Amino acid sequence: MGNTATKEARPPAGTSGRNGHGRGPSGGAVALGGLGRFHNQPESSQPGVSSRHFRGSRPDLSFLGIGPAVDRDSFVERKETKQERDARRLARERAARIKERERSMKEEHVDGGYLVTQGVYTGVEDFNKAVVRQLMIERRLAPFWKGLEEFSDSWTEHQLMAAARGLLIPAPDEIPPELEYKLTPPRLPEDQDLPDQNLNNLTVPITSRSQSYNSDLSSTTHPVSPSISLQPQLSPGVSGSPGAHLFRGRAKTLASLTASSKHSSPGEMSPRELQLPKDPFVNGQPIEAYLYKNPIECPICFLYYPPYLNRTRCCDQWICSECFVQIKRADPHLPEHEQRDPNSPSPDRPDGQLISEPAGCPFCVQPDFGVSYTPPPFRRGLSYIPSNSLDKTLLSPASSTSSLVSGNANSHSITTRRRATSLSANSPAVIMTDKIRPDWAHKLQTARAQAARRSAAATALHAAAYINAMNNPIETRGMGSSSRRMLRRTTGHGSDNSTNQAGSVALLAERRAIAADRENDSPAESTSNLAPARASSRRNRMDELEEMMMMEAIRLSLASEEERRKKEEKEAKKEAKRREREAKRAEKLARKNGLYSNNPSSVALDATGSNTAVRTGRELSPPVSVLEPSSDKGKAVDRPGSLSEPPHTDTQLPGLPKLSLKTSDDDLSSIFAPSSAAAAKRSHLRHISSSSSSNSSLVGSACGELIGSGSTPNFNSAIEPVLNFRSLDAVIDDENTNGSRHEHLEGATKLKKTQQPSNDNAISPRPNRDLGLGVEPGSVQQATVPPQGDSSINKDENDVRDKELQSHTAETMHGGNTNLETVG
């Protein structure tokens, strides 16, 4: 019963999942996250551990690193995207490149130049660095020289050394301690053991010593680098004098190389690098001073370099290696912009295939850009030990570490002679841009394959659509109608643009005609069209693409036109609403600021006031109405109907004083220019007001009419408006006797005589305070002088006169003098 399959056995203490973090054999894997145990040990190899433990049956122990949390952590680790991996890879490569550059600049050089770029260009270095390094060590391409931003012909040797090393340029007579050097070569130490076999392979037996003794002596003081060993090429039992075993060692070396070449791959036959003896001097000068004493300027980057630069094969122009490695082929593209030479044969490629044109010269724009390089006459730094032509290298003077500048006239003439003609692109001395980027052909083939896959997919899609259209013409018509509906929707409902509609109709008619032509084809032609040629399918795709672009342009044009029309309609609606609001506002303002109020009394007097205003505005000199004397005692209200207009004549009653109103200038008329409507309104208010007597009403109405008559601007001075003023005495004289008329006439005559010297002055009545008019003093002369000493006026008349004329004054100006008389 206890051995049934359903009963789980308790694991031992050493293999328990709970206690196995540090004591079991798998405790280390569990402590690291519980993931290594799953991958390293199968489930069957752990008899004491339950299967439910691996399925994560204990979620409460997930914080210990056991259970589903471990799977979640591993899942989070696996979510890294390809872009992040590429970014991390590029960052690692960049860091490694920086370290390699620092190491190479400290330990490696070729004739005083470097094998890594100097930072003139900060872009991506997409050239093959191994190929460039090999070409520089072989002296077929100029090394990356240190460029100088400035140069002076007067610089001394230590100044040139400081500029080449990137230090501050000292004074001409000042030599820093780090730039001091000794020309005496060091002696060979007695305790230094130099292998004879290395000397046999690095020196050549010559009959005469070279003239550059310093370089020869310095070469013997520096042994071969310990990293480069030639012991496998020689027999380990070689002994004796160097002269006896010289040629035997070479024969054994050649035999070993020949034997190894039969069993080695081409990758293993790459040349081996050799570190030449370190010699900081060339012909008794520091190598920096020797290189930079006659620098040349690169015409592209404008930096000064030693006179050992690359030359273009076509136009023989200087170009540094920094600029040369930046020039490359164009990316694969279609041959629309290809500039083919008419004399060259047509390439064997189908139409429409991607091409990659070779780089052109930056100076003469000739294709197949390449450079050639002539190395300096000395060898320093790294070099190669060729495996296939070792005997030729050993016998050539270029393999020696000595300088060849002063001894060999033939080599001197070769190095200094300028090339007269251009070199061919196939010349072995020419380095093409394709050589430092050998993967250009692979990139071109990849781009062509990708374009072919896209073209095949598009061809299959179009063929399937064509077959579907041939088999189901009803669906084709439905698709055509849907496209027409879509086009109709883009044009907009109710659009009045006839040009767009005509263009759409023409486009639809053309498409319908093409569809009809396809339907009318014979079965044989239809069968042949199912598998069209590649060129014809490509042309059809181009035509369809152009048609789609045209329809898209038409749709965008119609959409923009519809948007413009809607915008114009919206602006018109806004303008109409604005005008309507302005009209309502003006009407409301006019109703609010009307001429008369809406009370019943003003409405009743509207007609009379308007007639008075019109009459006052049109008549130049309105006559004064002659009022009949009232029989009452002045308590009756003078109605407007009691006014009677006499005929327009100048006849007056005899004995009445005739007073005329003149204006000397326009300023007086502008001052006394109230509106006629306002004067009429005041006149009516004066008529309907309750006054003490009819004479008081008469004076108020006369004053109102006088002000109203004076509101006519700029009237002719030749026509004198005659205003007949009837004084209170004249009214009383009409009622009583005629004798007093003569007295009044005498007073009027006296007044005329008094006013005769001042005819130019205007005479106007002083406005009453009840009218609310302000008049400047001295600008108006009022001549209302009643006769004094009238014995015929009774007591009642005197009372009325005292009552009515108590507040009136008369001002008479004669030549600038003002006489003020107060009556009463």
UniProtKB/Swiss-Prot annotation:
> Where is coiled-coil annotated?
none
Q: Where in the cell is it found?
A: Cytoplasm
Asked if the keyword Cytoplasm belongs to this entry, the reply reads: yes
Q: Where is the composition biased (Polar residues)?
A: 210-222, 493-503, 595-614, 779-792, 807-824
Q: Where is this region: Disordered?
A: 1-66, 183-202, 210-242, 256-278, 397-421, 473-503, 517-539, 561-662, 735-824
Q: What does this protein do?
A: May negatively regulate the SNF1 kinase.
> Any idea what this protein is called?
Protein SIP5
